[in-house]
From Swiss-Prot:
It comes from Corynebacterium efficiens (strain DSM 44549 / YS-314 / AJ 12310 / JCM 11189 / NBRC 100395). It catalyses: oxaloacetate + GTP = phosphoenolpyruvate + GDP + CO2. GTP binds at A273, C274, G275, K276, T277, N278, R390, R421, F516, G517, E518, N519. Keywords: Cytoplasm, Decarboxylase, Gluconeogenesis, GTP-binding, Lyase, Manganese, Metal-binding, Nucleotide-binding. Monomer. Belongs to the phosphoenolpyruvate carboxykinase [GTP] family. GO terms for molecular function: GTP binding; manganese ion binding; phosphoenolpyruvate carboxykinase (GTP) activity. This is Phosphoenolpyruvate carboxykinase [GTP].
């Protein structure tokens, strides 16, 4: 196929990959865009797109002195978060999607979406965005190409992925790639005026696991539209991982170095908005300890030649929740944004062209423009920034970025943490007995709801196995089987699994543990447990730290609060048993025998504790 066969293509196609060119030509015929542009990932391209989006009213250029080369986008109020009810796993067999996913027959879904896609890019530019998951130097890279009519998405992907010419070169003339289609679903007829944030009330976020395709329609927001993020890095990658013998997980990756210079690496799975980014960017309060971030959201875990599990961050940027981020809770995130080059979405705008959100340092300004574009004062009875408002910034700007984030081999994982928001029941930190016990603990992870999903009822408890509930690309029971299989393969070289809970509350509702930088004290105990240097108390859930096992020097939290935070009350665990049993039943017949056996053992421990 020649370049001429792609109507509207600007200039020559920078590739001879016939499969790619044919696919683009088919997409042009379907979407009917006005122009087709290959994104090259250059600074010139970023600057040009930014200027165009400022002119269109999609972006607001922020104060150049305070936020150089940074922009604010305000989305349509109907398009502010992931939409789980419109997210589909379209496997050939419904059973392969399992009980936790919405399923539709792939052929029927493709026919349905083809109709909404038809002509959906009229009057718009279709961008061809080649990207690489993880470091571009990987000899066996996972590649993708997204076709999108959103320049905001292209700008976001330049931050979030290794995108552009280098990725296209990596695909080469016959390389394989995951095909990602995205349209905001807002065609422009001739003479029709555009809106600042085009989207459609009808939304689809669809994954096809057998063919490794992603089709998205109707949303311009984050994870619905930046298809390299949750759609590829977790939903499609988890399917690849099961087929190829690795794991794609919703985990941060943290490098910790002790005063002796020994480095350790921790991967941690928490549900969205439960503190992954804060932990990934932790500033340890214990003297002599150093923390560096490898990733804050997604980890791909693979065995290397030495038989150990290594973690790679497939992303290149942070897409962090803004509200609550400040110089006390997460100084590293704030410092990462200081050099600029940041895309903000749905935060508030100050009168001098800076940004603001709830929980930022200092008092709220006397006047703001809120995320909907309206005047706001401290007397206003609604938040100035949307609870799920975001900042998007490159990892390389982070002052504590570990150099290993650019190493395709990744880092050896010494410990895995699971954790959510539980006001009671779950102690501050516990080591599980072994990999199978840890898998069961992860399978029964439950947390309070957050605003990261558009449909969440905030505060209610929801089960979230391994923090992967919205992101498993296949049957949840088979996903847990992959955990068991990985443990069997790795044997005694597998990392230890721990359960943490920063959010225990006292009877009066106060937090019992100060959290944030003080969590380094818990991480030190985790490392000391791995090295066999510190004790623990056996509780119903595992080996739980005692107050005297933690390094509490210089901490002014009452010792009684810490002791209470470390309890694992058998009666509270007993109260969860029925709910947990029902949940394992809900997950279906493919849940591994080992998980059921571990749950039965937990029940026996709880009954024995209650009897004594």
């Amino acid at each position: 196929m020649t370049t001429a066969a792609i109507p509207g293509l600007q200039g020559e196609a920078p590739t001879n990959n016939q499969e790619l060119l044919n696919w683009i030509a088919e997409a042009v015929e379907l979407f009917q865009p006005e122009a087709v542009v290959f994104a090259d990932g250059s600074q010139e391209e970023w600057d040009r797109m930014a200027e165009e989006l400022v002119e269109a009213g999609t972006l607001i250029r922020l104060n150049e002195e305070k936020r150089p080369n940074s922009f604010l986008a305000r989305s349509n109020p109907s398009d502010v978060a992931r939409v789980e009810s419109r997210t589909f796993i379209c496997s050939e067999n419904q059973e392969d999607a399992g009980p936790t996913n919405n399923w539709a027959p792939p052929q029927a879904m493709k026919e349905e979406m083809t109709e909404v896609y038809r002509g959906s890019m009229k009057g718009r530019t279709m961008y061809v965005v080649p990207f690489c998951m993880g470091p571009i130097t990987d000899p066996e890279p996972k590649l993708g190409v997204q076709l999108t009519d959103s320049a905001y998405v292209v700008m976001s992907m330049r931050i979030m992925t290794r995108m552009g010419k280098d990725a296209l070169d990596k695909i080469g003339e016959n390389g394989s790639f995951v095909r990602c289609l995205h349209s905001v679903g807002a065609p422009l007829e001739e003479g029709q005026e555009d809106v600042a944030w085009p989207c459609n009330d009808t939304k689809y976020i669809t994954q096809f696991p057998e063919t490794k395709e992603i089709w998205s329609y109707g949303s311009g927001y984050g994870g619905n539209a930046i298809l390299a993020k949750k759609c590829y890095a977790l939903r499609i990658a988890s399917v690849m991982a099961r087929e190829e013998g690795w794991m794609a997980e919703h985990m941060l990756i943290l490098k910790l170095t002790n005063p002796e210079g020994q480095a350790y690496h921790i991967a941690a799975a928490f549900p969205s908005a439960c503190g992954k980014t804060n932990l990934a960017m932790i500033t340890p309060t214990i003297p002599g300890w150093k923390a560096e971030v490898v990733g804050d959201d997604i980890a791909w875990l693979k065995f290397r030649e030495d038989g150990h599990l290594y973690a790679v961050n497939p992303e290149n940027g942070f897409f962090g929740v803004a509200p609550g981020t400040n110089y006390a809770s997460n100084p590293i995130a704030m410092q990462t944004m200081e050099p600029g080059n940041t895309l903000f979405t749905n935060v508030a705008l100050t009168d001098d062209g800076d940004i603001w959100w709830e929980g930022m340092d200092g008092d709220a300004p006397e006047h703001l423009i809120d995320w909907k574009g309206n005047d706001w004062t401290p007397e206003s009875n609604q938040p100035a920034a949307h609870p799920n408002s975001r900042y998007c910034v490159a990892i390389e700007q982070c002052p504590t970025a570990a150099p290993e984030f650019n190493d395709w081999k990744g880092v050896k994982v010494d410990a895995i943490l699971f954790g959510g928001r539980r006001p009671d029941t779950v102690p501050l930190v516990t080591q599980t007995h072994d990999w199978e016990h840890g898998t069961m603990v992860g399978a029964l992870l439950a947390s309070g709801q957050t605003a990261a999903s558009a449909e969440a009822k905030v505060g209610t408890l929801r089960h979230d196995p391994m923090a992967m509930l919205p992101f498993m690309g296949y049957n949840a029971g088979e996903y847990l089987q992959n955990w068991i299989d990985m443990g069997n393969k790795g044997g005694d070289k597998m990392p230890s699994i721990f359960l943490v809970n920063w959010f225990r509350r006292g009877e009066d509702g106060r937090f019992l543990w100060p959290g944030f930088g003080e969590n380094s004290r818990v991480l030190k105990w985790v490392i000391d447990r791995i090295e066999g240097r510190v004790g623990a108390e056996e509780t119903v859930v595992g080996y739980t730290a005692r107050a005297e096992d933690l390094d509490l020097e210089g901490l002014d939290t009452p010792i009684e609060d810490i002791r209470e935070a470390l309890t694992a009350p058998a009666e509270q665990w007993a109260a969860d048993l029925e709910d947990n049993a029902e949940y394992l039943t809900f997950l279906g017949p493919k849940v591994p025998t080992e998980v059921h056996e571990q749950f039965e053992a937990l029940k026996k421990r709880i009954q024995a504790a209650q009897a004594s």
